[in-house]
Amino acid sequence: MNFVYGYGNLQGYLPLREQLSRQLADINILAHPNAMLTTSGVSSAIETIARAMCQSGDYVLVDDPTWFWIIGCLQQLGLNVIGVNRNSHGVDIAQLQQILESYRPKLYITNSVLHNPTSFNLPPNNIFEVLRLMAEYDCYIVEDDVYRYFIEDN
């Protein structure tokens, strides 16, 4: 009866987190269910991550073009938003490196699969370059991977 009248687990429904842990393990991402937090959607997830990882005045990267909501959300938190050019060939690596050197952003919010709004997937060689630069400049990637299961081989 407590379940009906009480609040649920703040981290989210445990069986869901356990299932997510198994699915992530299938793609070699080890994440214990107790280290996970589920949200009601990507909007609240991005806002929660930005609040936890950034302070007002920090720089955050987004794809250019990007989903319009992200920019407004980040700016409301006092964050400086910088767009990184992206097209069917992937992220502009030279521009990304220049931005990382100049601004030292905390986060890069992106979709590598079925990017919104372009629907392009990042090519593997481009993904590896992005990952290399993120590691080199200590910038975290926030991957909005909502469309992953809409393409074959996933």
Which role fits each region the language model picked out?
Residues 3-138, 148-153:
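Conserved core of the PLP fold type I
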Residues 144:
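Glycine-centered flexible beta-alpha turn that most often forms the glycine-rich phosphate-binding loop
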